[in-house]
Amino acid sequence: MKPIVLMTQTHEYQDQRVAIKHVPLIETIALDFDDKALCPHYDWLIFTSKNAVKYFYPYLKLIKYDQLAVVGVKTKQLCDKMKIDVDFCPTDFSQEGLFNQHPFKKGDRVLIPSSRQARTFLQNALKESGIQVTKIDLYEVQPKYESIQEILDTMMHRQVDAITFASSSAAHAFFEAKPPHNENIYFAIGQQTAQTIRKLGYSCFVAEVQTLESMITKIVEKRFYNDGI
């Protein structure tokens, strides 16, 4: 029997190795911002998520930029689908990975459109390196409390083998509800999300690579190990 996996990210995903049910823990709400705050030209535009691409797309025509950097293979794939040329994508799919491998020069003007709750590591690190950074809050994330309760009920009836978390926002939404401590079913897609879960007092497994495919591989490996296969 395939492992039953509850996936909590906002976009759907399927994998033949497991039985997936999507239970998004957060929803995104568009925010208003004054587009007059945008400069006419940037050296770099940075997208750190698929949502950033989706919410900023209507504003692309208002600016000119020389090059585009993205975080994550899924973000790049969405850009490719929308005919947006990507110039740089780090091999480590995280803000830290982008900073450590970044091609920006001191004095470059960089625009980062993202969520209101986005981590500030990248913008702060770039500023400290002498790069001019503008951060725009395009949207915010809010918990979906009915989804949190649905997962808690499923856990109570032992009808799940794994629960996955693809963002710190989703982790906060769920673990702040004080779910049971079950070290065998919580899985994180990346080190930053895993760190958030651990800071909230819980343990989890972490995907080897920051992709959904890698996380499913980790789930299957752990399921076979636990079953003694």
Q: How would you describe each model-predicted region?
A:
Residues 1-229:
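Signature of uroporphyrinogen-III synthase
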